[in-house]
Curated annotation (Swiss-Prot):
Induction notes from the record: Induced during growth with sulfoquinovose.
Gene Ontology biological-process entries: 6-sulfoquinovose(1-) catabolic process; galactose catabolic process via UDP-galactose, Leloir pathway; glucose metabolic process; single-species biofilm formation
Taxonomic lineage of the native organism: Bacteria, Pseudomonadati, Pseudomonadota, Gammaproteobacteria, Enterobacterales
Encoding gene (name): yihR
GO molecular function: aldose 1-epimerase activity; carbohydrate binding
Protein name, entry field: Uncharacterized protein YihR
SUPFAM superfamilies in alphabetical order: Galactose mutarotase-like
Organism superkingdom: Bacteria
Species of provenance: Escherichia coli (strain K12)
Pfam families linked to this entry: Aldose_epim
């Protein structure tokens, strides 16, 4: 593949995260890696808006990765579809689950480049655990006024309907400060309780689990690793660090969002993962998409920073 260079953008040679693309627009700078179509860095006025990782290293905790054809977990890596049972590889042994899909560690291809945007594409061939065929595309667009906009699209290019879900795994941060200091606001009034393997059990009102962030509230020592159902299918959440005078917002058009307080990353950021369905949807069927042959699905989200 020939490498294309345009002003304000540079593509590196191959490394652990594939290739690196640098984007810039106004006070925003973004680093995208081709492995997992991942968001490796996003800054605003020099401040980190997501926990970054070095492109030359394999990141922890699925930092910034695109999650296709399912987000989060499938319990025991097993599901039934149209009367047939399928077994996926278990890649999170602590929860005995197949986690975060099949494209998070695949190298995507760069198909379009500009100074402020990049389009990445991937082909997902059939496999024993997921015998369906998808073409996926991620478009990262950086704007000096609105920040980073991302569209994730997949199309079923097979001949039979495919079970499908999608998400993405950014860790929002107020310049790598502790989440304990953040004010967190999320317009979601329902949240799942989980079992000992982190699988969702019962949907509760957020007050029942003491996870009501519909009004901005300090996270403090609260540990969060829960799936929330948002009040609307177009929503915006915000974290704010008052002393840093910095806020980071994410908006999306999906009803579900996984929030994790980042214990694996020293609580330097909050994973906020827009998802088309909750965990284990391949078994529960809740908001599981059945992509007919030729049909597409799109997920949109946007991240931007503000100085208070």
């Amino acid at each position: 593949m020939s490498l294309i260079k345009v002003p304000c953008m540079q593509i590196t040679n191959m490394h652990c995260s594939g290739q690196t693309v640098s984007l810039a627009a106004g006070d925003y700078h973004a680093t995208i890696v081709t492995v997992g179509a991942g968001l490796a860095e996003l800054t605003f006025q020099g401040c980190h808006l997501v926990i970054p990782h070095k492109p030359e290293e394999m990141p922890l905790a699925h930092l910034g990765k695109v999650l296709i054809p399912w987000p989060n977990r499938i319990a025991n890596g097993c599901y039934r579809y149209q009367g047939q049972e399928y077994q996926l590889p278990i890649n999170e042994h602590s929860s005995k689950a197949a986690i975060h899909g099949l494209l998070a560690w695949r190298d995507w291809q760069i198909s379009e480049l500009t100074a402020t945007s990049v389009t990445l594409t991937a082909f997902l061939p059939p496999s024993y655990g997921y015998p369906f065929m998808l073409a996926s595309q991620v478009v990262y667009s950086l704007n000096a006024h609105t920040g980073l906009s991302v569209e994730i699209a997949s199309q079923n290019i097979g001949t039979v309907a495919a079970p499908y879900g999608v998400g993405i795994h950014p860790y929002l941060t107020c310049n790598l400060t502790s989440v304990d200091e953040y004010l967190f606001q999320l317009p979601a009034n329902q949240v799942y309780a989980v079992d000992e393997h982190a699988n969702p059990t019962t949907l509760h009102h957020v007050d029942e689990l003491d996870l009501n962030f519909t009004q901005a509230k300090k996270i403090a020592a609260t540990k969060i690793d829960h799936t929330f159902k948002t009040a609307n299918d177009l929503w915006e959440m915000t974290i704010t660090h008052p002393q840093q005078a910095l806020s980071v917002s994410l908006c999306s058009d999906q009803l579900w969002v996984q929030v994790y307080s980042g214990e694996k990353l020293q609580r330097q950021g909050l994973a906020v993962e827009p998802m088309s369905c909750p965990p284990n949807a391949f078994n529960s069927g809740i908001d599981l998409l059945l992509l007919e042959s030729g049909k597409p699905h799109r997920l949109f989200f946007n991240i931007y920073g503000q100085r208070k």
